[in-house]
A protein has these predicted regions:
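Conserved G/P- and acidic residue-centered "switch" motifs that form tight phosphate/ATP-binding loops
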Residues: 131, 149
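Flexible, glycine/small-residue-enriched loop-and-beta-strand segment within the central core
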Residues: 41-51, 56-125, 150-159
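Short hydrophobic beta-strand element within catalytic cores of glycosyltransferases
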Residues: 137-138
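Terminal amphipathic alpha-helical/low-complexity segments used for targeting or macromolecular assembly
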Residues: 1-34, 152-156
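Extracytoplasmic/periplasmic beta-strand context in beta-sandwich domains
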Residues: 123, 144-145
Length: 160
């Protein structure tokens, strides 16, 4: 509940309030270089979120960080995206017992996420990807790819 309370406190502050950076530091355990994180923002633990340099997190993002969520340098995350590490059993008997596991998410450098993207447990997204609005990324994606759809697939390779 500590992280949830800190996220609530962050989300009550004005964008211009100098206390924001201190609250973000308390959520993550550090303050990344050149981070822009807009409210509202929600995380489960905070300590499992590893953000690179020059990361932009737009409004209304959720980081379900039961496992590590590692975001590379120069990553731009559009509004209302979710990074979900928790995975529940298909078998209802196990699910009803509260069993779940968390799988890490990794995002390479120089990626751009459109609005309302969902990244599911255990996914790795290579560097230089553009993920279209509304995509649901359920499997690993290669670097320099335009990714779209639900479930998401590679639309084309981005020539750099």
């Amino acid at each position: 509940l500590i992280c949830q309370d800190l996220c609530f406190a962050l989300n009550q502050l004005k964008p211009s309030d100098e206390k924001r950076n201190e609250v973000i530091k308390n959520i993550l355990g550090y303050f990344p270089d050149d981070l822009v994180l807009l409210s509202p923002f929600t995380a489960d633990y905070g300590k499992n979120i590893k953000l690179g340099k020059n990361v932009f997190v737009n409004i209304n993002n959720y980081f379900m960080d039961g496992a590590t969520i590692k975001i590379g340098d120069n990553v731009f995350i559009g509004p209302s995206c979710g990074f979900y590490t928790a995975n529940h059993p298909l078998d209802y008997t196990n699910r009803n017992q509260g069993l779940e596991k968390a799988l890490p998410i990794k995002v390479g450098d120089n990626c751009w996420f459109g609005a309302n993207v969902s990244v599911m447990p255990g996914v790795t997204i290579g560097a230089g990807c553009v993920i279209a609005a509304g995509a649901v990324v359920t499997k690993d994606m290669p670097a320099n790819s335009l990714i779209a759809g639900a479930p998401a697939k590679v639309i084309k390779t981005i020539e750099q």
